[in-house]
């Protein structure tokens, strides 16, 4: 039986996740300055709890919430990658976590066609951004090709 969150709990959860993204976004805006991020690793560390909480939300009753926060988080992370020097290990670590989260969403069978298309498009865009970002770094070509591989292979259209 899936855990059913009350309206109050859902509001607190939304506020908590919004607050994490807001805090990370504000520190990102100050990157390379005091109080801001100096490296992608720092941003990824602060963003990890966001994705851990999103991945723990029961999908059976809250697919819309999980989908929305997953899409927002992925979109935010891929936008921030370009603002830092290439950091392959951190990039692939985060995308491995995101691939698992997306795969869970896809395999739930609860995604609408529209959300599936949005998710697929975002995952493909992420691949292109990472390939472009790491084009000057040797030895990561196969890793770039594997970003969201499990999730993209699970989409049936």
Curated annotation (Swiss-Prot):
Recorded superkingdom: Eukaryota
Transmembrane segments: none
GO biological process, one term: transcription initiation at RNA polymerase II promoter
Cysteines engaged in disulfide bonds, as pairs: none
Gene Ontology cellular-component terms listed: nucleus; transcription factor TFIIH holo complex
Entries under PANTHER family matching the protein: ADR380WP (PTHR37781:SF1), TFIIH COMPLEX SUBUNIT (PTHR37781)
Protein name (database record): Uncharacterized protein C1494.09c
Organism: Schizosaccharomyces pombe (strain 972 / ATCC 24843) (Fission yeast)
